[in-house]
Amino acid sequence: AQGTPDAVMQPALLEAVYHTPVLTQSNPTTGRPLVFALAPDDAPQVPPDAPTAFVIAGGGSGAAVYYALLAAGWRVCTGVLNLLDTDEEAARALRLEHITEQPFSPISDDAYRRARQLAQTADAIIIADAPFGRGNLRNLELARWAQEHGKPIFALESRPIETRDFTDGAACTLWRLLVQDGMAIAPDLPTLLEHLAPLTPNRAAASSTSATA
């Protein structure tokens, strides 16, 4: 391919040429693209009957959460993510089922509907430490809808929601409602995984065995 590095180093193009999933990020010093090749077996293997987590992420907040959940034995799906978002690239590299929206576009009715259908099949909803603006506020609305329909909600909050709310308070309002109705808050990934342990069959079985020993 010919063109600038930014034009050529596109994940879809690289994957088509080299037949392997890749993740691209910008070098924080030079701004040039960095490409990470991921072997197909880089993602932990999860049995088909494992519990499923629907992750609400964006802006790079989800990649570590995806991998940690997979390593803990969860199946993972995610959305709604804008194309070109690093979390969308990570989801594609890990071969996760995910719902996308066009770059820099607000979440459309169609994307929201498809994300809601996907979330409906999940055993838990996880909200990553993502920023929320008018374009992705519907992701929080989706979490609220899922909570009202009986889904357990868990949130990773290493930064207060007030510092991530770019909606003139709408995100904070939804967040307070989620907390009020039982959303579990974790300050870091290990704590999040501990919150999820009762829903993870292997962990739950291990805890039961330990308790009866």
Language model features: what each stretch is:
Residues 5, 63-66, 136-140:
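Conserved strand-to-helix beginnings and helix N-cap segments that scaffold or border functional pockets
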Residues 11:
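Generic structural marker for isolated residues within well-ordered, non-membrane alpha-helices
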Residues 135-153:
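A short, gly/pro- and small-residue-rich
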Residues 119-120:
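A short, aliphatic-rich alpha-helical micro-motif
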Residues 15-113, 124-128, 154-158, 162-168, ...:
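ABC ATPase nucleotide-binding domains
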Residues 1-4, 8:
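ABC ATPase "signature
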